Amino acid sequence: MTWAGDVEEQDDYFSCSDVSTSGDRRKRAPQTVTQEEVDQATSKIANEGQLSIRDILASQDTAVRITNPRDYQMELFLRAKMQNTIAVLDTGTGKTHIATLLLRHVLEEELENRAKGCAHKMAFFLVDSVNLVFQQANVLRCGLDQGVEGISGAMGQSLFQKQTWDKLFAVNMVIVCTAQVLVDCMMHSFMSISRMNLLIFDEAHHAKSNHPYARVMKDYYAHELDTSKRPRIFAMTASPVDVKGQSAEHVREAARELETLLHSRIATTSDSALARNSITRPEEEVAVYTRLRNEFETPLHQKVKAKYGDVAPFRKLFITAKLHASELGRWASDMYWSFAFADEQSRKLQIREELKYNRSKRDWSAAELDAQMARLKEATAFVQQYEIGAPTLSEQDLSSKVMKLQYWLNLYYERTTLARCIVFVEKRHTAQLLKLIFDHIGGPNLHCDVLVGINNRAGEENVSLRSQILTLQKFRRGELNCLFATSVAEEGLDIPQCNLVVRFDLYRTMIGYVQSRGRARHRNSKYLHMLEAENKEHTERLMNARHDENIMREFCKDLTHDRQLGDVEQEKAELIALEDKLFPSYTDEKSGAKLTYRSSLSILSHFVATYPSPDHNTMAQPTYVVNPKISDDPRDPQRNGFVCEVILPEHCPIISMVGQVYSRKTIAKCSAAFKMCIELRRKDHLNEFLLPTISKYLPAMRNALLAVSEKKKGNYAMVIKPTFWKQDRDTVPESLHLTIIDADRGLDRPHQPLAMLTRRPFPQLPSFPIYLTDCRPSNIVSQSLHIPISLTPELLEMFTRFTLRIFEDIYNKVYDYDVSKMSYWMLPVIEHRVASVRSMSNPQEVLDMDQIRKVYNEPFWKWSPQSRTDDLIDRYFVDPMNGGRRYYSDRLAPHLKPQDPVPANVPRQNHKFMKNILDFSDSKWMKSRDITRWHQDQPVLQVEKIPFRRNHLANVEDKEKKELANLETYICPEPLHISNLATPFVVMCYVLPAIIHRFESYLIALDACDVLDLKVSPALALEALTKDSDNSEEHGEEKINFKSGMGPNYERLEFLGDCFLKVATSLSVFVQQPEENEFEFHVRRMLMLCNQNLMETAVGKKKLYKYVRTDAFSRRNWYPEGLKLLRGKGLKKTEEDWLNVTHNLGDKSVADVCEAFIGAAFMQHHKGGQWTPNDWDEAVKAVKLFANSDDHLMEKWTDYYAAYTKPKYQTAGATATQLDLAHKIEMKHPYRFRYPRLLRSAFIHPSQPFMWENIPSYQRLEFLGDSLLDMAFIMHLFYKYPDKDPQWLTEHKTPMVSNKFLGAVCVKLGWHTHMKQNTAILSSQIRDYVYEVEEAEREANGAVDYWVSVSEPPKCLADVIEAFVAAIFVDSEFDFNVVQKFFDLHLKPFFLDMTLDAYENFASNHPTTRLSRLLSINFGCSEWRMGALETETLIPGKGKAIAAMVMIHDKVHFHSLGQSGRYARVRASHAALEKLEGLPPYEFRSKYGCDCVDEGEGEAGVDEAAVSKKVELMREAIGPSI
């Protein structure tokens, strides 16, 4: 994966035949696997015994990983299109990739021909063994999007029925089969040469004598006299002939005979081309074992011979047993007898069956067979009575040859099971015996089995074939890691993990040597020749094989120039011969640097090598594709020539350039390179010295995202009062608008709703919670009435006096009476009338006018002896001398008198006078105190002291809990005022400060909306403006200075807005810049997305910082502005003092608020359900506002499509191939394309030359589709999990948008087969991944997270999904419904349950963990670490870089350079893994000087705690990013 979704531009400055004959080559009997088994698909290996052969093979992993692109493959493909070709290439060089390219080309031509009404033709891929039928069929299915079927004799009698073949030809366009199957098919005229369009021969060196390959050519191909009806021939082999010590002339003659037979010409590549493409062979080593003992008879052998030596058919068994005694040891010879008689018995049974059907056979009689069967049973019983025991690792039981093999295998399997080994033997019994031996002596990490040819025992053909296939499958999966194999494994079996091949029995031919060596496919692999000491025959066999291989290489090297591909030396010679005056050149005006045709190749290579790559495996060289074309060169009399397209890696700023037509390929390549360099210079990717400008250009663009930091803070003004209160102020209102406010779940005491009267209609604000003493939430609900209350001067005065009395009695604030300065009025309402208030013609009827008049006329009263005691209950008591002493009276306390001591439970804090209850009730200062003036017989009341708590928007804080725990106290009434405010109304007024604070926050948020001209609800607007901690933007981190009670902060909306901003800017550059590529898209989008750009809008133009809410509720700032304070706290402060508030805001916070507002605009108008363009108009408007760029001028969604101009490639007529693709895609996803060429573009990889179809690659679409899919994923998470924070959302978005998931979806849909690409690495990587992920899905039994555990897929698979989404979006005229439908059908089912462990932990994986375990566990090394430092580079045109290093025993072995330490370390880990994985522990110790002593061996001895500690130590050693 791009690690956990991270992508960073990377600086990769350094990168980091005939076969031996044996029993396996017997003539094979017809197979009896049924048609039903072949056709039916079954699930998983739990029932392997019942799986069909085809289904088993369909899950095999047969790819070889190729680490570089190969230009010779393209040249060979282009040649094979033009003429019949025999490709002579070494094993592991990607011959099958060339065949796939050729098949794709031929099938596209076939589709066009069929569309024209031509007769249907088939392509045949011929192989030499049943195994290879299914293997190659699976390979082709991954690379072709037409039907491919593998056929072998396993289909039995149905192959002799015309209906079978007609059905196969109807549903497939490619048949993979053994040559004998094709011969039989053609013999019965089910197929003819004229009905074929392509014949491919795999391992073509078999085409000789009477081999089926030869019969196809001699009996059928040659007999088609009309050459125009013959199919194209493409043959592949590592060696066209087996040299066998013959002279070079004989080899040339044999090669000519092969060419004649196949009607083809040999083409090969030079060693320099292989070296240039990093084709490496395994390291070869010779293991010499001491001379074997002469053949001898063991004691058991002697006993068997004494008893049964007279039986003539047993004689060969005695000979074989003596041979095993010599080659394998005593134990193997004795063990041989245990199954030798069983084998013989099976053979006799077969003969008896044959006698039943063949009475003319006279060699045997039934009586003779019966007699021999009796002796066989007797001998079997005789052997079984002996206890052979287990072999010991000693010369007594084992031969020196087996002991040497054990030594080498132990080197690889001493610690882990990771190695994969194939041991080649000559005889079937040798493989079986070695398997039995190593079951005992191989150790806990060696898991072995045998791989032998299909035998011919009666009734067992199917089982034997099935067993062979399952064994290979287990070997690929790692359940087996060592195979003892006969020559059946020599040809064609691709096992990428195989890193050790042992020739236990030496090859007998050069082809056997070359083919078996080719099985070692791992990059760190070894090929081991086992030779007997002083055995001249062995030495000569080794020398002859190498000599014959050299003869063959010399033969290839001596081929004429037109048969050799990619000869670098020849190209250099041609370039030197060029004369600059004949071709254009460029001289830079500033520096005088000169670019010529010749130098352009090296300039371009240097540019690519130094260009940052996000993918370590991406090809790091230009690819040149040369096509024949009519020449414009006047010097070419034949007017035939070549045109070249140069293709750069997909991360480069320009991908493709087509040169001019020239008569020579080399000049055509120079032309393309020259034009590319000119374009790079024009766009400033090359500087005046023709060096990359990357160190100046890319960092500036990339750092746009990092241009601001939260650590950089500014001191900004903060608005604390909304403009709403200022409307019509300084006037006396003639009417007021009423808003009723209530708490839906009550308060701590019974309460009365209140009415707020305002000069203008109050906006309808959302409900919000306040928190009661017991932490229960109760929602404040308001309803605004639009019918005003008409006022008289008397009524207005009454309302004003009442409101000011609230401030005086409850909050101890005395304001000057000034109606014109009032912001609002607070009045009680009659609760039972609230429900019908909207139906009232006069809203004044809801007001509690009795209470209002009572308070107006008599704000309070005092106790006197004449007062009734009933009037003292449930009253609000105010201490006129102390603003902190307010009480609710609960009941009389008749058991107490004023002179009694203050009860012990009454809190003493801040009370100086505690002599008695009366003394406690008087709070006058000492000088004015005289408690004797109070009546000494007045009653004592039990009251509830009203706490100082004001911030009801937050839960009760710890410091408040102590006060709230003990509110009961006792007072005498006479020293206090008894307010005429009703107690329930007072209870409501005590939460008024929190209500006013939140109301004002909403109103300020609406002010911000007015400034921005955005229609957003108060709730969302306030959420977008709320920053409740110093580090709100650091999701998942512990909050610093967190302020409770502020409501939801901007984090979630910012997360949503960031996503929509990406969609909108991606879409705008997509439609406005039709000629630019993905690189330029990224730059333009980055400049709009960057925080610095958002800052300029928010700070410079709209001053959005004023409206950001960074402070929680303040006891000082909620009071109304404008009124003159006469008494109370803050008297000395002017209004300007407390209104001029500032706050510190980080630059990133301001930018985040911008994105949050985009998210708010999106959420406000996105209705859900069926999408309409209007849903997103307001969000688009917000993006235009904040992006503030000419690259985004759209104000509503429909503006995007209005700005889109369909490119010519989209509207051009579709070919039959493109229509066929659209039809196939529609079968998987229900959408019919209006423009099939647009769909085709979504499947074209950047490596595919543009000139082949004149359709651009998917890069532009992938750029857009990435953001569209992001939107779909985030909408799903955002609305399904409304309470999850951005950290959780980000972590759970990570698996959704990962390449790993989208790659798995691509395979599940089968769309990997439709991708058109021209890079060998992708063919093998896709094949590897397809087999692995399909196997994981089968094993998962329906679990949707099966894809998490598989390897990282090629990024192109995920790109295809993103490009397809963009394609349907564009084709549908920018209708997001089609994106949503794709998400709902194919993606959403994977994420219905986000609590799966695989998803919860997805984002926490890291490559360094793999490296840590590899070094600590597999190799047992404790002296290693990672480090990073800043360093200068030696590359021209480069500045400083970060070097990340992997040190082993104080020596740096692996490193990576980049402009980010974080990513450089990841790449350094990848580089180390690439070199270390597959090495056996002994070789690691040898290469890297490791002498660490580890406690215990093997996986059982691993201390996981120690390993985990090592991981932590490693991460600690890495340190922070530089």
From Swiss-Prot:
Keyword line: Antiviral defense, Antiviral protein, ATP-binding, Helicase, Hydrolase, Magnesium, Manganese, Metal-binding, Nucleotide-binding, Repeat, RNA-binding, Zinc
CDD domains named in the record: DEXHc_dicer (cd18034), RIBOc (cd00593), SF2_C_dicer (cd18802)
Cofactor(s) the protein needs: Mg(2+); Mn(2+)
Amino acid composition bias (Acidic residues), ranges on this chain: 1-12
EC assignment: 3.1.26.-, 3.6.4.-
Keyword 4Fe-4S: no
An example Gene Ontology biological process: defense response to virus
Domain PAZ, chain residue ranges per copy: 859-980
Domain RNase III: 995-1166, 1222-1373
Domain Helicase ATP-binding positions: 76-258
UniProt domain Dicer dsRNA-binding fold: residue ranges: 600-700
Domain of life: Eukaryota
Keyword field contains Manganese: yes
Residues annotated to bind ATP: L89, D90, T91, G92, T93, G94, K95, T96
Domain DRBM: 1409-1478
Region entry Disordered, spans: 1-37
All copies of domain Helicase C-terminal, residue ranges: 408-576
Span(s) of short sequence motif DEAH box: 202-205
GO cellular component term of the entry, any: nucleus
Chain positions recorded as Mg(2+) binding sites: E1262, D1359, E1362
Cross-referenced PANTHER family: DICER-LIKE PROTEIN 1, DICER-RELATED
Family to which this protein belongs: Belongs to the helicase family. Dicer subfamily.
Full protein name: Dicer-like protein 1
